[in-house]
Amino acid sequence: MDKKLENQKDLLNQDPKVELNSQSVAKNPLNSREVKPIQRRRPLRKNARDKNSKPEFEERVIAIHRVVKVVKGGRRFSFSAFAVVGNKKGRVGFGHGKANEVQDAVKKAIKDAQNRLVSVPIYRKSTVPHEIAVKYLASKILIKPAPRGKGIVASNTVRAVVELAGYTDIYTKTYGSRTKINVVRATLKALLKLRTINQVAELRDLSPQQAQAQKV
């Protein structure tokens, strides 16, 4: 009986923690060197936009019109939006969108403008290469080069187009109808007719220096 009591006391006095032998430690996969480290989270996708980064193209809403259509059941209202987009590096576009809501019409106009991008020449990274006058329907526009630092002399409608195209120094003057849509189309028509010195020299079989000395 005394031996049994002594054995029970020894069991009670033992440390409750279980001691691991060398074999159990070796078999434990967590203690082996072959266990791979925990993988980090996947990096962000390349096409994911950074919140702090600026978009390549900027957009401006030129006009929003409400359209009313009379049907048997009454009147149906919709909206028509016009927008200009550009990267300020010689790329600019003008688009039109229709929808039942203003926001949807603006989105469609911006998307349409992005699909209609055109390239325009920028002389010395600030102005147009030469003077030009263009007429579109009842609207007329005159565009002249300006010295560096002069800024943009233009109406709000024309300013939206030339700024997004990338011009920083330019003179403009509009005549006739001041309808915003016609003015924008006249401005784009004028910009598309601009020619660089190299283009003029190639057309006239002259050197760039000779073409620059002559009036374009």
Curated annotation (Swiss-Prot):
It comes from Mesomycoplasma hyopneumoniae (strain 7448). It comes from the Bacteria. One of its GO terms (biological process) is translation. Keywords: Ribonucleoprotein, Ribosomal protein, RNA-binding, rRNA-binding. Residues 20-31 have a biased composition (Polar residues). PANTHER family: MITOCHONDRIAL RIBOSOMAL PROTEIN S5 (PTHR48277:SF1). GO terms for cellular component: small ribosomal subunit. The N-terminal domain interacts with the head of the 30S subunit; the C-terminal domain interacts with the body and contacts protein S4. The interaction surface between S4 and S5 is involved in control of translational fidelity. PROSITE patterns: RIBOSOMAL_S5 (PS00585), S5_DSRBD (PS50881). Residues 1-55 are annotated as: Disordered. Pfam families: Ribosomal_S5 (PF00333), Ribosomal_S5_C (PF03719). Belongs to the universal ribosomal protein uS5 family. This is Small ribosomal subunit protein uS5. Part of the 30S ribosomal subunit. Contacts proteins S4 and S8. The keyword Ribonucleoprotein applies. One of its GO terms (molecular function) is structural constituent of ribosome. The keyword RNA-binding applies. Residues 57-120 form the S5 DRBM domain. With S4 and S12 plays an important role in translational accuracy.
